[in-house]
A protein has these predicted regions:
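Active-site loop-to-helix junction immediately N-terminal to the catalytic Tyr of the SDR YXXXK motif
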Residues: 52-60, 103
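Substrate-binding pocket helix/loop in short-chain dehydrogenase/reductase
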Residues: 2-3, 7-12
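Residue(s) in the substrate-gating loop at a strand-loop-helix junction
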Residues: 46
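Active-site-adjacent segment of SDR/Rossmann-fold oxidoreductases
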Residues: 51, 72-85
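Active-site helix of classical SDR
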Residues: 26, 62
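C-terminal helical subdomain
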Residues: 89, 105-142
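A short helix-coil junction within the Rossmann-fold of NAD(P)-dependent oxidoreductases
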Residues: 28-37
């Protein structure tokens, strides 16, 4: 949905669910991890937290915020000497669940939930700080932004289907629908 067609309540709900909830969860559980100097904090962001997607403004903003929160938390833990508490942020592409029903994934296939779970488990086991799923998307996004002028990046995203991926989006149907 266009930013200009999104209600204030809908935007607030997306931010509360996707971003604010991370603050409350971290505040609740991480102090005990700091005390033990042990634990893993895993936050789920999205590739939309690395690359803006047309008609997904609120969602992208909420997922970019998660990336920033986790980087900031990691810095705070480092400064406090809690080096045994590991932070990981997972940025998956579209996952084949009802949440993204109708989405057009472009040239990439939808991810299976198991692929994302495996990436999370790998992050916990090996202390990965930033994980994209599929793994190569992080490099693709960063290299495009580093090497190409922004209008060319936007054209690439258009050709790859990223900018039009939400045009056919319907989302999960609720019982009321």
């Amino acid at each position: 949905k266009s930013l200009f067609d999104s209600s204030e309540a809908a935007i607030k709900r997306v931010m509360d669910v996707n971003t604010t909830a991370h603050f409350w969860t971290i505040r609740e559980f991480v102090p005990a991890m700091i005390k033990r100097n042990s634990g893993s904090v895993i936050a789920v962001s999205s590739m939309a937290g690395m690359t803006g997607t047309a008609n997904l403004n609120d969602y992208c903003a909420s997922k970019y915020a998660v990336v920033g929160l986790m980087e900031s938390l990691e810095g705070q833990l480092y400064n406090e000497g809690a080096r045994g508490v590991h932070c990981s942020v997972i940025c998956p592409y579209y996952i084949d669940t009802g949440m993204f029903a109708g989405v057009n994934p472009g040239v990439l296939p939808l991810l299976k939930p198991r692929q994302v779970v495996n990436a999370m488990m790998h992050a916990i086991e090996y202390g990965d700080h930033f994980v994209t799923c599929p793994w190569y998307l992080q490099s693709v996004v960063y290299l495009c932004r580093l090497l190409l002028p922004y209008p060319v990046v936007m054209h690439c995203f258009k050709v790859l289907g990223v900018l039009d991926s939400m045009n056919t989006f319907t989302g999960r149907k609720t019982k009321q629908e």
